[in-house]
Amino acid sequence: MRRYAASVALGTLFVVAGAGPAMAESPEEVDPLVVQMLEDVPGGVLVDATHAEWPELGMALTVPTAGDLSARTASGSCASGLICVYKLPSLSGAFLSYSGCGVLAVPGDWTVRSMDNNRASGYAQARNVTTVLATANAGSWTNVGGTTTNIRCVF
């Protein structure tokens, strides 16, 4: 009987532990966009209620809070050295940030409406497969039209 109970407990632990993306403990309710992205893009780790990261992809998601919206800088909220793609025009709304360079995949459900190239050199292109939709030189940003499937970063 003890062996059976231990097997059931261990099996339950494996099922619960492997049920979804890795998540840090947080008393706040996780933003629905963060939950959706963690379900849609494998390998994500929940940082807090409004942030998730995909270490293997060099990608992070940030959903701004009311406080974040009032603390915006001249280059949006994209940290130095990153390329960020925003869901709304003029560097507004939730955004994905990329630390790598090359051809960077944009998740299928993500709509890019503006892009910030907060790198010191080169340029970034929002593209639909190979068609360039918009280009942002180093230290600048641009609004984006059309359906973006990838970002091409060139040093």
Role assignments for model-derived ranges:
Residues E25-F155:
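Compact beta-sheet-dominated domain cores in extracellular/mature segments
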Residues M1-E25:
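Secretory targeting and sorting signals
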